[in-house]
């Protein structure tokens, strides 16, 4: 069939939908709005309102917007085939949306409409759409059925392994449908022929009635017609017989037509029954496929278990004479169990000790955090006291420097006096002539006795200077200890003063922030109050606010009812989740049993190998094929286990996807209900309500700012402490 005719037939099929967008011609369908609306009617669960909202309604002559809409429609249809229907279109040429958007290409439009037709005949409401197709014209119906057949031939299931029996049943049902369709066409043709015959007979009947009327007139005119001896009478009798025969034949034809109409209705009912049976057969085919797969898996597992049982029997026969080995095995098992229990107890004790240590460490960490906070406070105090002590130390050092300078000056004066004393003594000795005796008595001025020839004033002054010199030396030696004690006292004073100043500073900052918040609140209240003329407006606003609050309470009550309905539905979901959890636990338990059996088999196999090697070393060469066969069986079992694990992972992924879909559906439903409640609230509310809520938000913002400002210093200190 020509692609143009196919496109026209599909456009006629699309006209069976009740669409708001224009959809009479290819140009009307070029923007993709009508097709997206039809997809929303075909599968509203998949093509939702949010998806339809992405379609640009005002594309007009802008071919780029039309191309964007058509791309969204094409990707949505392909995703529906792969995700919902589980089919992949292999050899079907996808439509070129660019040529449709630019040139309104009829061939590409026909391909796109053919894909939408496939979605319609495979969706949940496919029976309704098939009935609509059966009610169309014969040529259009034939073209649409050919398009469906072409699309079904190029579809392939996403999961391989479709049974040939199912395909055979599908072909049989398709052949039955074709036969029923042909029988329907024959019956329709027969009904048409009967209608034509009835119409002809009705025309003949009308003619005969006219002729009868004429003859009756003639009979009335001529009474001699009733006489059979005359030709007119014989003609009259013959015509009356013909009229009676024609009436009987018309009655018979009408009854036949009614019978054929009833048969046609019965055939249509049979067609519907066959379509339902076809769906049931498809479902049964899928179930049989799953059951056959399970039977194959169970058959393979049964064969492998029988092989394993045979091998176990052979090993049992070989191990009947090895009682000592069994005893040792049992002893080893008991010992391993005892060791495992001991290890488990040790681990439990270690875990308890570690838990107690962890609790102790947590307490220590908390104590250390407290100590760190105290130490930070002490450090701040110590810093302030250190500053004060450094200032005091500077003053003490200056005082020390002054004393050192004074000491140096006193030393110089002492040396000068000593020199003067020596000069005076020498002069006196020279004058008396006792040079040798006096020269032997002259010694160091500090440690020697003062000569008797020195005058008493100078002697007193020298003694006083020596005493002062000794005192200065002792004071210089003890100044370090005194400085340390003084600096420690100054440091304590500085620390105490620093703590006091910090607390005062924080209290002052908090008081300043509180006063700022109060000032802002007073300013906002003054701005809200304004002039006395606004009091009336505030009263009206309060009344409106009360009305809106009542409406808001009604909306909240409705929302609460909807939430209760959702809460009533949630136990069903929780019960299904519990069932899934139980099945998962059973599956995990079976996996653990399989792993334990596999480990036990391996252990028995290794022990048997070691026993065979120790008992009969000559048969090691002959037993290698058996060992190889056992290895092959183990590899097959490992492959089976890997296959089961992959199936388990797939089932787990599908279950997680189902849970995500359920959760997303619940969230979407809750969001829609919340959105409806908010929209109803906004529709019932007015502009005054928005203004009032804005003022309320401003008050809340100022109050929050006040609370944050009051709590900020402590919070900042805690953040610094954590860092």
From Swiss-Prot:
Keywords attached to this entry = Coiled coil, Cytoplasm, Cytoskeleton, Microtubule, Protein transport, Transport
| Chain intervals with Low complexity compositional bias | 696-711
A UniProt-annotated Pfam family? HOOK_N
Q: Does the keyword Phosphoprotein apply?
A: no
The UniProt record lists the keyword Coiled coil: yes
Q: Name one GO molecular function term.
A: dynein light intermediate chain binding
Give the function comment from the record: May function to promote vesicle trafficking and/or fusion. May act to link a number of membrane-bound organelles to the cytoskeleton.
Q: How does it assemble?
A: Interacts with microtubules.
Q: This protein is called what?
A: Protein Hook homolog
Native species: Branchiostoma floridae (Florida lancelet)
